[in-house]
Structure formats: structure tokens, C-alpha cells
């Protein structure tokens, strides 16, 4: 995949993800992990995640980026509003804090790119796909875990 296509794909997925997260949706949709896992696979398949001329620095940058992606996925998961309706079905919806967390994620990613460029590290676009994919996987898993801990609806009282 060429660099421009990878960037376009990352931006499209980012826009779709933010749009979907800001809408009321059921928790635990079966396909919630499909797109993020595809992003990770595409990013890894591109290869060249490590600059051979600056291997140690590029590995540290990539590792730092992935750690931040995981942390920000968790942060976004905890900004989501989760509730049960009267029938007991779990729902979730993003809040303004979710948008703020996305802005921080984008700015952080840009910061890693700027740090790499200033150090002379040749950056490939595969890492952006892995960053967003991993962050979305962590967020989806954490939202489901939070939802499972949500108290079940009160049992109906049976009158004798």
C-alpha cells in the first residue's frame, strides 16, 4: 500500500470511528474489533516499521507510540457513557471528553512523528495504522469490560 493511500485510509477510519463513537450504539457489537484488527494487519504488512539507519531510536519511538495508543484507548473507553435500558440491554455513547481524548491522541501521534523527523528517523505510514488500530482494539475491549461490570437491572418483584 502506498503512503498516501495508507494516510487516507487512516483518516477515513479515524473519521468513521469518531462518528460512530459519538452515536448511541449497543455495547458489544460483534464486528467492533474487525476494522481495528484489519488496520493493525495492514500496518504490519507494510513493513519498514524500523529505520535501519536509526534502529534503536525508531524502535523506542514505535514502542512509545504503541504504549501511548494503549493508554489513550483506555482513556477513551472511560470517557464513554455506558448504561442499561429498561430491558437490560447495554448501550454506550461518546461524550465531549471522548472527542478531547481523540484530539490528544492525534496530537500525540503528530508529536511522535515530529520527534522522529527531527531525529532523522525515516518514518513509514504503517505505524499510524498500527497506532490507531491498537488504540481502537483497547478501547473496544475496555468498553465491553466496563459494561459487564454495570449492575444488572433490578429484578422484578414477584407478588404472591
Q: Model features per residue range: what roles?
A:
Residues 1-53:
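N-terminal signal-anchor transmembrane alpha-helix
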Residues 1-11, 59-71, 100, 125-133:
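Structural signature of hydrophobic alpha-helical transmembrane segments
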Amino acid at each position: 500500500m502506498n503512503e498516501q493511500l495508507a494516510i487516507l485510509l487512516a483518516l477515513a477510519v479515524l473519521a468513521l470511528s469518531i462518528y460512530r463513537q459519538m452515536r448511541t450504539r449497543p455495547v458489544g457489537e460483534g464486528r467492533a474489533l474487525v476494522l481495528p484488527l484489519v488496520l493493525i494487519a495492514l500496518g504490519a504488512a507494510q513493513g519498514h516499521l524500523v529505520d535501519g539507519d536509526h534502529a534503536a531510536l525508531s524502535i523506542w519511538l514505535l514502542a512509545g507510540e504503541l504504549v501511548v495508543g494503549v493508554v489513550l484507548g483506555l482513556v477513551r473507553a472511560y470517557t464513554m457513557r455506558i448504561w442499561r435500558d429498561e430491558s437490560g440491554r447495554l448501550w454506550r455513547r461518546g461524550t465531549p471528553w471522548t472527542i478531547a481524548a481523540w484530539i490528544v491522541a492525534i496530537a500525540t501521534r503528530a508529536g511522535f512523528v515530529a520527534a522522529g523527523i527531527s531525529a532523522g528517523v525515516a518514518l513509514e505510514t504503517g505505524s499510524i495504522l498500527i497506532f490507531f488500530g491498537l488504540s481502537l482494539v483497547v478501547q473496544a475491549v475496555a468498553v465491553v469490560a466496563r459494561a459487564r461490570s454495570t449492575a444488572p437491572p433490578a429484578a422484578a418483584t414477584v407478588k404472591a
